[in-house]
UniProtKB/Swiss-Prot annotation:
Subcellular location: Nucleus; Chromosome, Centromere; Chromosome, Centromere, Kinetochore
Record note on quaternary structure: Component of the CENPA-NAC complex, at least composed of CENPA, CENPC, CENPH, CENPM, CENPN, CENPT and CENPU. The CENPA-NAC complex interacts with the CENPA-CAD complex, composed of CENPI, CENPK, CENPL, CENPO, CENPP, CENPQ, CENPR and CENPS. Interacts directly with CENPA. Identified in a centromere complex containing histones H2A, H2B and H4, and at least CENPA, CENPB, CENPC, CENPT, CENPN, HJURP, SUPT16H, SSRP1 and RSF1.
Pfam families: CENP-N
Ranges in coiled-coil conformation: none
Organism of derivation: Rattus norvegicus (Rat)
Gene Ontology biological process: CENP-A containing chromatin assembly; chromosome segregation
PTM annotation (Phosphoserine): residues: 227, 236
Family that this chain belongs to: Belongs to the CENP-N/CHL4 family.
Gene: Cenpn
Listed InterPro entries: CENP-NAC/CAD_complex, Chl4/mis15/CENP-N
Name of the protein described by the UniProt record: Centromere protein N
Role of this protein: Component of the CENPA-NAC (nucleosome-associated) complex, a complex that plays a central role in assembly of kinetochore proteins, mitotic progression and chromosome segregation. The CENPA-NAC complex recruits the CENPA-CAD (nucleosome distal) complex and may be involved in incorporation of newly synthesized CENPA into centromeres. CENPN is the first protein to bind specifically to CENPA nucleosomes and the direct binding of CENPA nucleosomes by CENPN is required for centromere assembly. Required for chromosome congression and efficiently align the chromosomes on a metaphase plate.
Amino acid sequence: MDENVAEFLRRIILKIPLCEMKTILEAWDFLSEDQLQSINLKQRKEFLAQEVILLCEDKCASLDDMALLDLMYTQFHRHQKLWNVFQMSKEPGGNDVDLFDMEQFQSSFKRILQRALKNVTVSFRVYEKNSVWIRVAWGTQYSQPNQYKPTFVVYYPQTPYVFISSCYLKSTVPLLHQALKVASKHHQMAQLDLRSRHLDSLTAIVFNEYDQTFENYNSTASWREGSLGLKTDLDSKIIHENTEEKVRIHRATQEAFGAYPQPQLEFAQYKLETKFKSDVGGGILADRKEPLRCLVKFSSPHLLEALKSLAPAGIADTPLSPLLTCIPSKKMNYFKIRDK
């Protein structure tokens, strides 16, 4: 086995958590069952990596085999990437329904990249919900592909959506987009203002897969009794007012966010560009031609659930601004706010 391939494999093994080692190697389906059983998973990672390298040398493992293992590791740890969402479209009057041929898609995608760029490594794997995972390691006309900084693509056949991890070589982005459009038989490709490390949440948002069934508020008696925690010895009027206010906040929150778990996003960003306006005449900003610019960014490990909890916690009034509640429905978490 080539020295560079062995080093690539060593680095992959070192970054796989021991608790996932057996699962990932089994899913890789390169080593035999007997070889997998012979691996001592209780030894130090460095020795474990050498043992796997020797087993792969016996089977004459190639760079493509290692690239596939790296792709599988990324599928298990997809949250380590920042994913951008793109929406493709067909030509006006084009056929909206095309039969998808997996082999043709892979062949066309790979051929376009290799025609334009001699040194490129492309790997494919069909994963959950028939999604096509693609790993592209980019080189140049004069250098071999950098296997340690690949781009990952997740495409759902017969849909317009594709998810792409950040590319370290910006010059390769147009070529990647061209290969995707041609292979999937689309004409245009536009980036949405939506990105996150939680790929599953992004797919739930663009495909509207999160539960949108709102609760029925015709009867709130059981909710009042079980969740308010009011003391029975308080004045009955105060209890009634507190109960009604909590019910109102609860209803407004559920109407805005629904009664289902929210997709997990880490941030939302708002860029404000607006002219200065004042009822008071004059002022140093009154004649300013350039718009005022402001950037506001909200961040949280689970931003939408955090926003959903603001009003019930008494931190914000209801209803919340539509700019905060429309993120899933608008399919965006990057906003530009102008005068219009």
